């Protein structure tokens, strides 16, 4: 299992491979993403820039990086908290589109029989499919992320590090 993040530019980042029984909140404390975000925010604070945060499901707890959806599980939920959850949930739809796009472009990810026939591991297939989906996103200039967030994807050269 991988901890996955979808960014406003449409790119997907997979981090921190773990055994299948590890949940995202369990994987978060040891992820390189958390360490990178803490470092980045320290750099931004040094030049007077605001911190970056990640919005996450209710299953997460809010910490110095994550802002989790408000849940009665963690205490009283006020009307303004419910309003914020409503606004943020509409933006989270874009996150689900990212993973849906990977599965749409690589339909064999949804078919256990196909994976058995070609002898591949679903995890390896998903990693490759995510890489190719990100490459395709670099060429897509009018996707839902651009429309929703106004953030263009990186060029293919930027993404592949050239």
Residue map of PLM features:
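Short, well-ordered secondary-structure "scaffold" segments embedded in the functional core
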Residues: 1-162
């Amino acid at each position: 299992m991988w901890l996955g993040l979808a960014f406003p530019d449409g790119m997907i980042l997979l981090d921190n491979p773990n055994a299948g029984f590890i949940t995202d909140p369990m994987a978060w404390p040891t992820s390189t993403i958390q360490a990178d975000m803490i470092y980045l925010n320290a750099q931004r604070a040094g030049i007077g820039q605001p911190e970056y945060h990640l919005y996450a499901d209710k299953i997460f707890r809010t910490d110095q990086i994550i802002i989790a959806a408000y849940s009665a599980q963690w205490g009283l939920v006020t009307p303004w908290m419910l309003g914020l959850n409503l606004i943020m949930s509409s933006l989270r739809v874009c996150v689900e589109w990212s993973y849906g796009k990977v599965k749409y472009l690589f339909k064999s990810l949804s078919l256990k029989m196909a994976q058995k026939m070609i002898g591949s591991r679903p995890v390896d297939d998903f990693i490759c499919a995510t890489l190719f989906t990100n490459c395709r996103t670099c060429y897509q200039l009018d996707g839902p992320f651009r429309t929703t967030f106004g953030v263009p994807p990186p060029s293919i050269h930027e993404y592949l590090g050239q």
